[in-house]
């Protein structure tokens, strides 16, 4: 269909996405004869620049096991799929440096907590945050480790964007754990 569009209507087709896979094989198979031109120069260098984390699959974790892992870390973000799950994990964490974010909070309360969280991250103080997916988009925080309950790839990648966001740590020290 793409090849027909380009050929019959003398069109240029632009394919773009935030997480673009290699298109060479797809174009060779489904759009033979359609030349592909990379619009973004030096993509290999860009991939290297944005390779800031490594991923780990932890399998299924109980609330207790998850809270135990989180408690062993000084600074960590944990994103779960429901408010109920967030509350269940949060109540098992040490009180010092523990934060719970939910859409049930009024925006001003969330903003105040996010300000405190950012400051603790900067100061190197304990900061263990349990949140729903509200923190995945539009929230600028940088954790050394992120735990993400299994969700769609887009959600996992958004969560990964909260780990080593500023690129100050090597990827080997910036772990995104999917459970």
Predicted segment positions?
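Short glycine-/polar-rich loops that comprise or flank the Walker A/P-loop
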Residues: 9-11, 48-53, 96-97, 141-144, ...
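Conserved segment of the helicase C-terminal RecA-like domain
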Residues: 125, 158, 162-179
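Interdomain hinge/linker at the junction between the two RecA-like core domains of SF2 helicases
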Residues: 4, 8, 12, 16-71
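Conserved two-lobed SF2 helicase motor
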Residues: 121-136, 148
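Conserved nucleotide-binding/hydrolysis micro-motifs of P-loop NTPases
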Residues: 13, 19-23, 59-62, 83-86, ...
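Conserved helicase motor
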Residues: 81-84, 98-115, 130-136
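Conserved strand-helix element at the start of the C-terminal RecA-like helicase core
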Residues: 71-94
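ASCE RecA-like P-loop NTPase motor cores
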Residues: 1-11, 19, 93-96, 107, ...
């Amino acid at each position: 269909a793409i090849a027909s569009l380009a050929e019959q209507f003398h069109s240029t087709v632009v394919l773009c996405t935030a997480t673009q896979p290699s298109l060479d094989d797809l174009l060779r198979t489904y759009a033979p004869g359609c030349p592909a031109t990379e619009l973004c120069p030096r993509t290999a260098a860009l991939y290297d620049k944005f390779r800031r984390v490594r991923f780990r699959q932890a399998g299924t974790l109980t609330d207790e096991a998850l809270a135990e892992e989180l408690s062993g870390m000084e600074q960590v973000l944990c994103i779960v799929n429901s408010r109920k799950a967030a509350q269940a994990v949060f109540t098992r964490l040490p009180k010092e440096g523990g934060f719970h974010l939910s859409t049930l909070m009024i925006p001003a309360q969330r903003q105040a907590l996010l300000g405190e969280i950012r400051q603790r991250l900067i100061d190197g103080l304990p900061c263990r945050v349990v949140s729903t997916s509200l923190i995945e988009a539009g929230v600028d925080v940088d954790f050394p480790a992120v735990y993400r309950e299994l969700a769609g790839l887009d959600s996992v990648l958004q969560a990964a964007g909260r780990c080593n966001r500023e690129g100050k740590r090597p990827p080997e020290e910036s772990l995104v754990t999917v459970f």
